[in-house]
Amino acid sequence: MEEPGATPQPYLGLVLEELRRVVAALPESMRPDENPYGFPSELVVCAAVIGFFVVLLFLWRSFRSVRSRLYVGREQKLGATLSGLIEEKCKLLEKFSLIQKEYEGYEVESSLEDASFEKAAAEEARSLEATCEKLNRSNSELEDEILCLEKDLKEEKSKHSQQDELMADISKSIQSLEDESKSLKSQIAEAKIICKTFKMSEERRAIAIKDALNENSQLQTSHKQLFQQEAEVWKGEVSELNKQKITFEDSKVHAEQVLNDKENHIKTLTGHLPMMKDQAAVLEEDTTDDDNLELEVNSQWENGANLDDPLKGALKKLIHAAKLNVSLKSLEGERNHIIIQLSEVDKTKEELTEHIKNLQTQQASLQSENIYFESENQKLQQKLKIMTEFYQENEMKLYRKLTVEENYRIEEEEKLSRVEEKISRATEGLETYRKLAKDLEEELERTVHFYQKQVISYEKRGHDNWLAARTAERNLSDLRKENAHNKQKLTETELKFELLEKDPNALDVSNTAFGREHSPCSPSPLGRPSSETRAFPSPQTLLEDPLRLSPVLPGGGGRGPSSPGNPLDHQITNERGEPSYDRLIDPHRAPSDTGSLSSPVEQDRRMMFPPPGQSYPDSTLPPQREDRFYSNSERLSGPAEPRSFKMTSLDKMDRSMPSEMESSRNDAKDDLGNLNVPDSSLPAENEATGPGLIPPPLAPISGPLFPVDTRGPFMRRGPPFPPPPPGTMFGASRGYFPPRDFPGPPHAPFAMRNIYPPRGLPPYLHPRPGFYPNPTF
């Protein structure tokens, strides 16, 4: 970097010397005249021409730089497109490999599914055959194996559901396979389209590369031509500048010689000046003739004649000195102007040298770039050849894979047709097995209905027998009480006869005092006050305890713990130690015959019992009564006691009832209990209104509603209803409700006595569709 700063000084000296020589060598006619601005016209024209060429060169250089940048950008775009196409090709190859792997995995899965499906079908067929054999064997033992059959049915239903699920899964898998085959077809079509697009893009790329090569060659030729033209132009300019330099040097040498001569002449004139000062006065007088003298001086100067007169010679010398001063001043101005021009020429020369150096460096860089682009062009051609070969190989591979996939697809379609045939066979087998299962279910339902009917008939017989036994027990107790009463009457009459025999005036004595003091049976074991108006005391009745209403609910069941004042919380015993629970009055039972006016023949009929193993005759069928229910134990009394019924307790539902309803019910119960009267209108109203309605509380009754027997000190109620019509052996009793048809909700238990009125809720929930309840036996 130090050389450019060191070279300008000697170079400038040489340029100045050459300019001086050029100026000295110029003739006087070639020397430029002065212009109004102080510059010669030739220099101005040269500077304008040089400026014009400089502007043209600058414009051409800018055009070349812009053109080169556009070419580089275009090459970059082409490289980016090539890289994008290569990446797309790699992605497509990866997708194709993934699809091939998925297809192979799918083939393995389909083969495994076919094998597993065949095994499952065989196992299911075996299991179904085993279940059919088991069901055929178990038909003979349906009475003891109904629950087992239900379990088997549940298992078969689960198996059928599993089979349905398998069928759904198989159908889904078939649909998925079809979708996958469609997707593969679409992917194959897309791959073909992509291959076609690749071919088109390759052709376009080859055409673009050819165009780029042609453009490159054209640019190289144009660059060479332009470089040659510029070199020729610069050579001409340099030759012209050298010529100008020589002329300037010649003019400079001539000017230096003239300056030296004039300096010598000035020195001589300065020597003559003091001599001429003395003659100044004489010169003032001859000022008028200056013009003529000047002409004469010039003529004499040219001719070289010597002046004889010293005054005239001095004047001429003075005039010549003035002219020399003027010419010296003009020469100095020209000298300064030439020096300025020389400096400008040196500057332009330096600029030209620098520009030449820059052009040389640019030429070297362009040559290197040309070499680089040629190498890249060769590389791209090689890559194009390799890519074309690679694409051809890929096309062949893809075509082979497509043929293989088409073969696989044909095989899969054949397999799918086979699987569909197997599925159709399996569906037919499933339909047959379903029909068999339905037939078996119908047979089971029939057997269950048959055995339920038998159980219901047996329960009804047991219930009727139990009612007959209870009525017989009541009749026995009534007869025993009547016997005791008759014995008491006999003892009283015997005592009266004895007293009459002893003292006939003893009739005036009151029967009460006599009985209390002298009767062996007094005081009465029942603690009854004797009647003074009656001659014969009446026996104890069965209505000493307060009456409690016991309507029957269709669904059975009762409440939990009752109130502490309930007389049914414990068994009431009389003074003899006999239980008094039989004295409770049922509205559906016949009243006791203790105080009735029936004849002894009817009593004998009531005492008649059929032999064991036979039923009651229709004419002598005793009135049927419902089972009693005690609130503490919540159990049935009688033969139905050990049986367990699956009943939904209504205690939880009853807890949500308002307290006002329960208080009104309790008031109604207390009112009815204090009347000692069985109200038969309540069951009729309950039957009329239905089991879902709550009866309103009854008003207190002031007097007896039924005929009474006024023979004893206590009123004896007659039968509230006429006797029931005679029933058959399997006829429904008054408190019995027949079971509903199966299927449906579970059967209602047998009617039971209950101390509470019916509830305002349904006894059972609505049955669910397809739900078969368990039998209640």
UniProtKB/Swiss-Prot annotation:
Membrane spanning residue stretches: 39-59
Composition-biased stretches (Basic and acidic residues): 572-591, 649-672
Tissues expressing the protein: Expressed in testis, placenta and skin. Expressed at lower level in mammary gland and stomach.
Keyword field contains Membrane: yes
Membrane topology: Single-pass membrane protein
Main location: membrane
Name of the protein in its database record: cTAGE family member 4
Protein species of origin: Homo sapiens (Human)
